[in-house]
């Protein structure tokens, strides 16, 4: 028999019907390259987002952290509880329930900052919430996991990658701080950088989703219940975050910001924790869940963006008409109204 008909083209040694095929390291190389490229791009995008953050307003959120406190309740109150309820209600395996809870306990992702710009959110609040949630995750993640995972597993077996959290914090704070400085010193140049960065950020979000699908295409076969949870979880976060912020008396543009910060999780951190905490056998059951959550949090974020753009075009209104002027919240029209003209309806 002709060996060429049975041997793999990648075979390095053939003897009869027996072939030795070297293991492909394409995914490992692609993962390393793309991880490096995406990290650099993300830092550049966060620098551009920082160009829309005003130092005085950012410090104002720190000094009067009512918006941050609402976000904290959503991030480490609503999301872990929602994950727990979904896990119990669906009756999934213990290891799967733990992964769902890990996702619920993660801090907000930087993608929320990019999307907050596109829906005319409060960029100062968005950046401060992401920074604070990442910092507080150092203590809140172990606490939330201890509270909610006791019925399934010893929380001590879950490895919290404090180094990854620290890197995420540095990768967020440094570029944004530089962007804030540029906005303070050269506001006109900052607007140009912001426009370019906002478009690059939108492309980056899509690129991350595509790369994830390519790298882990063989892992998409997973229990249907996890697909259902991965669909419900992000939209529940968006909805509950919005309504809690509204219940707390926050203006509409901040409600949208809190909604995004609540539903959009740091899925990369979740994937890291899962890989560090579970055996290869368990990983086969759960590894895809962070990818599923990533896909649906982006899908629903795109839907929210589309609804917002449609609403503005149909009604011709901006947030200034909806800002409640109270003694506790006498903010002027947000600066993003003057910067982000992309979704302003045409005026005669």
UniProtKB/Swiss-Prot annotation:
Q: Which residues are noted as glycosylation sites? A: 3, 10
Which GO terms are recorded in the biological process aspect for this UniProt protein? Answer: bile acid and bile salt transport; bile acid metabolic process; response to bacterium; sodium ion transport
Tissue localization of expression is: Expressed mainly in ileum and kidney, low levels in cecum and proximal colon.
Subcellular location per UniProt equals: Membrane
Q: Residue positions of the PTM Phosphoserine? A: 335
Q: Which reaction does it catalyse?
A: taurocholate(out) + 2 Na(+)(out) = taurocholate(in) + 2 Na(+)(in); cholate(out) + 2 Na(+)(out) = cholate(in) + 2 Na(+)(in); taurochenodeoxycholate(out) + 2 Na(+)(out) = taurochenodeoxycholate(in) + 2 Na(+)(in); tauroursodeoxycholate(out) + 2 Na(+)(out) = tauroursodeoxycholate(in) + 2 Na(+)(in)
**One Gene Ontology term of the molecular function aspect:** bile acid:sodium symporter activity
Q: What is its main location?
A: membrane
Topological region Extracellular: 1-28, 109-126, 179-195, 246-284
**According to its record, how does it sit in the membrane?**
Multi-pass membrane protein
Q: Output the Gene3D superfamilies linked to this UniProt entry.
A: 1.20.1530.20
Which Pfam family, any one of them, does this sequence belong to?
SBF
Q: Where are the transmembrane segments?
A: 29-49, 88-108, 127-147, 158-178, 196-216, 225-245, 285-305
Q: Which Gene Ontology cellular-component terms appear in the entry?
A: apical plasma membrane; microvillus; proteasome complex
Residue ranges in the Cytoplasmic topological domain are 50-87, 148-157, 217-224, 306-348
Q: Which UniProt keywords apply?
A: Glycoprotein, Ion transport, Lipid transport, Membrane, Phosphoprotein, Sodium, Sodium transport, Symport, Transmembrane, Transmembrane helix, Transport
Q: Where is this region: Disordered?
A: 327-348
Q: How does it assemble?
A: Monomer and homodimer.
Protein family according to the UniProt entry: Belongs to the bile acid:sodium symporter (BASS) (TC 2.A.28) family.
What the protein does comes down to:
Plays a critical role in the sodium-dependent reabsorption of bile acids from the lumen of the small intestine. Transports various bile acids, unconjugated or conjugated, such as cholate and taurocholate. Also responsible for bile acid transport in the renal proximal tubules, a salvage mechanism that helps conserve bile acids. Works collaboratively with the Na(+)-taurocholate cotransporting polypeptide (NTCP), the organic solute transporter (OST), and the bile salt export pump (BSEP), to ensure efficacious biological recycling of bile acids during enterohepatic circulation.
Name of the protein described by the UniProt record: Ileal sodium/bile acid cotransporter
Which organism is this entry from? Answer: Rattus norvegicus
Starting at the broadest rank, the lineage of the source organism is: Eukaryota, Metazoa, Chordata, Craniata, Vertebrata
Gene from which this protein is expressed: Slc10a2
């Amino acid at each position: 028999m002709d060996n060429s008909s049975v041997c793999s083209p990648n075979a390095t040694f053939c003897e009869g019907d027996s072939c030795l095929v070297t293991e492909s390291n394409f995914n490992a190389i692609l993962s390393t390259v793309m991880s490096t490229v995406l990290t650099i791009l993300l830092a550049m995008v966060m620098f551009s987002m920082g160009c829309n953050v005003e130092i005085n307003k950012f410090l104002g959120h720190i000094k009067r952290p009512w918006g941050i406190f609402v976000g904290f309740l959503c991030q480490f109150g609503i999301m872990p509880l929602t994950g727990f309820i979904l896990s119990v209600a669906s009756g999934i395996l213990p290891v799967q329930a733990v992964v769902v809870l890990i996702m619920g306990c993660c801090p907000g992702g930087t993608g929320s900052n990019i999307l907050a710009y596109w829906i005319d959110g409060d960029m100062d609040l968005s950046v401060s919430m992401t920074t604070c949630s990442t910092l507080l995750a150092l203590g809140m993640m172990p606490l939330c996991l201890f509270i909610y995972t006791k019925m399934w597993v010893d929380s001590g077996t879950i490895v919290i990658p404090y180094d990854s959290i620290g890197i995420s914090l540095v990768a967020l704070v440094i570029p944004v701080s530089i962007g804030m400085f540029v906005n303070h010193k050269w506001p006109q140049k900052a607007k140009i950088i912001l426009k370019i960065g906002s478009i690059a950020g939108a492309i980056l979000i899509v690129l991350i989703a595509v790369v994830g699908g390519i790298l882990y295409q063989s892992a998409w076969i997973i229990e249907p219940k996890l697909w259902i949870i991965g669909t419900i979880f992000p939209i529940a976060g968006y909805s509950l975050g919005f309504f809690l912020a509204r219940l707390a008396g926050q203006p509409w543009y901040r409600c949208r910001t809190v909604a995004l910060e609540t539903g959009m999780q740091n899925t990369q951190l979740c994937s890291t924790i899962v890989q560090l905490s579970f055996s290869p056998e368990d990983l086969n059951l759960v590894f895809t869940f962070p990818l599923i959550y990533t896909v649906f949090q982006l899908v629903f974020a795109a839907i929210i963006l589309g609804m917002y753009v449609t609403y503005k075009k149909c009604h011709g209104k901006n947030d200034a008409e909806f800002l409640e002027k109270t003694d506790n919240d006498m903010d002027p029209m947000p600066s993003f109204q003057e910067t982000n003209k992309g979704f302003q309806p045409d005026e005669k």
